[in-house]
Amino acid sequence: MDWGIFSYVIIGLTSGIGAGFFGMGGGTIIVPVMLTLGYSFEHAIGISVMQMMFSSTFGSIINYKKKLLNISDGIYAGIGGLIGASFSGLILSVIDTKKLTILFLIITFYSFVKYAFNIKYSTNAAPPIKSQFYQRLILILTGIITGIFAISLGIGGGLLMVPILGYYLGYESKRVVPLGLFFVIFSSISGTISFQNHNVIDAQVLHTGIYIGVASILGVWLGIKLIQISSPKLHRMALLSVYGLSMLVTAYNLITS
């Protein structure tokens, strides 16, 4: 096997384990690593989004079999994701790379603080949206908003979807997380097409994304197995270490670029 392909397989396995073990978007691992390997921020995002197609599909199949996924909700959120992510190529082609990298760093830092201090979103006991029509509309709008920002930064949608759906629809996080993973299937496909249409990514990036994506499927499976045998304390320390390392590597690449 070519050493380049071998390294991509290792990256895919690692990001997949992160997704299965921590429930985090692969971008937290993939983007800093690809920046370190000399890829541009746009190409790193493109590779991260392509990887999401594979890991989110595999993860959603598992969630569906475990009856954790509401397909109806997922389709409406997915429609929004298709629409929102279609703008991601335009965003990456017009916004300065350094600004996007800083925003990625801020979001990673927020995630670190959230888990370090065990900050949890409260579910609205009396959600303002009761009508089924408006509930579906909220799902679509949430998908659009999340698709625009999350795919443009190569991150999962849970960080944005959990507080929005928790407030307006009263959804608990354990219901939103599988929904967010299913949403990523739609938004990542739309985002990849948008990246291609705006010449953000090329054939080499597509091939790299496929290698990493296929390897991430095995990584997700391994991550799920690992979480079953690890203690909560070890899981928490490992999660914070990954976020901390991601911030350090991203900040280093930002300063030296």
Predicted regions and their residues:
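Alpha-helix capping/termination and helix-coil
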Residues: 169, 186-197
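Residue-level recognition of specific faces of alpha-helices
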Residues: 20, 33, 43-46, 164
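Single transmembrane alpha-helix segments in multi-pass membrane proteins
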Residues: 14-28, 170
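Juxtamembrane transmembrane-helix boundary motif
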Residues: 1-15, 35-37, 41, 62-153, ...
